[in-house]
């Protein structure tokens, strides 16, 4: 699922994900219609929803369908604001994700991304990047597996 604010380049994100899925011979469907979230029968055909939607709006029906799919065992993944700043007016969505973007402290600057030891980060190496840092409100019950610090 892609859409929302163009500043996060959701179309570029979906193109990169599409290329990766094709390289792994994985079947996929691309959509930029949030009404698909209201269709539980449609969503139930998938194992994973990869989302890149920033600063958009969900109807109650769309939110209900998405949350029903996720609570039923369908996974959800995404990156950056495409997952953490998708639907500011939907607190049930934010609760399901485990957090919500709040601010970019310091704007664009150089950071080091540090991966903690975890099976999900196995094989990944720390790296430096110049970008905006995300200040998040997050559920204290989730396990943080990567952190950032100014360089």
Model regions: which residues?
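A glycine-rich, often tryptophan-bearing local segment used as a flexible ligand/cofactor-contacting loop or short
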Residues: 56-123
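Helical hinge/lid and interdomain linker segments adjacent to catalytic or ligand-binding clefts
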Residues: 5-84
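Short, Lys/Arg-enriched charge-dense amphipathic segments
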Residues: 32-35, 48-60, 86-89, 101-106, ...
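Catalytic beta-strand/loop cores that center a nucleophilic Ser/Cys/Thr
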Residues: 22, 104-151
């Amino acid at each position: 699922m892609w859409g929302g604010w163009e500043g996060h380049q959701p179309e570029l994100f979906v193109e990169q994900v599409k290329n990766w899925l094709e390289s792994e011979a994985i079947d996929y469907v691309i959509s930029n219609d949030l009404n698909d979230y209201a269709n539980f029968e449609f969503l139930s055909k998938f194992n994973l929803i990869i989302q890149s939607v920033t600063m958009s709006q969900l109807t109650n029906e769309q939110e209900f369908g998405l949350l029903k799919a996720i609570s039923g065992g369908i996974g959800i993944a995404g990156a950056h604001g495409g997952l953490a700043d998708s639907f500011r007016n939907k607190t049930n969505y934010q609760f399901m994700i485990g957090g919500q973007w709040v601010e970019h402290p310091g704007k664009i600057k150089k950071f080091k991304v540090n991966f903690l030891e975890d099976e999900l980060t196995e094989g990944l190496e720390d790296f430096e990047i110049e970008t905006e840092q995300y200040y998040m409100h997050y559920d204290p019950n989730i396990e943080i597996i990567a952190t950032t610090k100014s360089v």
